Design a protein with these regions (language model features):
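Auxiliary Fe-S-binding modules of radical SAM enzymes
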Residues: 1-25, 217-282
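Short, cysteine/histidine-rich loop/knuckle motifs that typically chelate Zn2+
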Residues: 12, 16, 26-29, 74, ...
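Conserved Radical SAM active-site core
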Residues: 32-171
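Short glycine-enriched, charge-decorated loop/helix-capping segments at active-site entrances
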Residues: 86-88, 94-96, 186-190, 255-256
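Conserved radical SAM core fold
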Residues: 88-89, 125-130, 155-162, 171-188, ...
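Alpha-helical scaffolding segments of alpha/beta enzyme cores, especially the outer helices
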Residues: 104-107, 133-144, 160, 164-167, ...
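Conserved glycine-rich "GG(E/T)P / GGGxP" loop and the immediately following alpha-helix
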Residues: 110-141, 182-195, 212-227, 231-233
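Structural preference for beta-strand elements that scaffold enzyme active sites
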Residues: 118-122, 148-150, 171-173, 207-209, ...
Length: 282
């Protein structure tokens, strides 16, 4: 959408990047072309693997099955602890990719259905919503083959993008990284947008699970996890929450891992409001 200045405004996420023709957005994955913004990473596959669905992590949806998992490049957040910075924090000229169409991915997913128990396609590894058009088109192709779609996302997207995708997403794990906008200022996101995504997907009938990575000194207080679990419970107390342990990565290699006792304590606090709380990386 043009803003009348010769620039185009990207409406994929709350950042609303203003882009001159040919410019790339903050996410490194969207580009201005004339009066519109397109996914520069459309069909660009950096990573592909057949994973147990529990690895997403999704614990209460087709447990014991596998899901063909694909990623591209780019992300609209800058979490200093990113575990996939090799693809999420780099652009298309820095990430080695192969090209695939939605139909080709759907055919590959179907091939693994009988041989290896594959239930469908998971959009993951980088932030899939910065290339939401490819997610939408692939999800439609998967549905035509009678298979399922799984989204693993930071959830920081516009209401319009979520509304476009929700009818085709069967299960999702959304990161709720912290309890407030103050935390999201640190990682470069929008707290209310993430909360809205969780609520919208749940309202659409999608199976939703949530992950919170516990970072020492940032979101590891009792009040932090209580606020996170209170919001989730306001949507549904039955939404599973994964409380996971931080390990030093990317720009936080000098930090210490979260003590296991801290993760377990916070999980116990979350269980006061939520019926299904799991610990991860412990």
């Amino acid at each position: 959408m043009s803003d009348g200045t010769g620039e185009v405004v990207c409406k994929t996420c709350p950042r609303h990047c203003r882009l001159a023709n040919g410019a790339i957005g903050f996410c490194r994955a969207r580009r201005a072309e004339g009066c519109r913004v397109v996914a520069a990473n459309y069909g660009k596959i950096s990573s592909i693997a057949l994973d147990p669905i529990e690895k997403k992590p999704i614990a209460f949806f087709h447990s014991g099955s596998n899901v063909l998992s694909v990623g591209s490049y780019g992300c609209n957040l800058r979490c200093p602890f990113c575990q996939n910075d090799g693809i999420s924090q780099h652009g298309g000229d820095e990430v080695q990719c192969r090209t695939a169409t939605p139909a080709e991915l759907a055919d590959l997913a179907a091939r693994f259905k009988d041989e290896q128990g594959n239930i469908g396609l998971a959009y993951t590894y980088n932030e899939p919503l910065v290339g939401w058009e490819f997610v939408r088109d692939s999800a439609k192709a998967i549905r035509k083959r009678g298979m399922l779609n799984v989204l693993v996302s930071n959830g920081c997207a516009s209401e319009e993008v979520i509304a476009e995708l929700a009818p085709f997403i069967d299960a999702a794990n959304i990161d709720l990284k912290g309890p407030s906008q103050d935390y999201y200022d640190w990682v470069g996101g929008d707290f209310k947008a993430v909360c809205r995504t969780i609520a919208l997907l749940h309202e659409a009938g999608c199976h939703v699970e949530v992950t919170t990575l516990v970072v020492p000194g940032r979101n590891d207080s009792d009040a932090d996890i209580d606020a996170i679990s209170a919001f989730i419970a306001s949507v549904s107390p039955d939404i599973p929450l994964h409380v996971t342990r931080f390990f030093p990565r990317w720009r936080m290699t000098d930090a210490s891992p979260t003590p296991v006792a801290t993760v377990r304590r916070l999980a116990d606090i979350a269980r006061r409001r939520l019926s299904r709380v799991l610990v991860g990386n412990c």
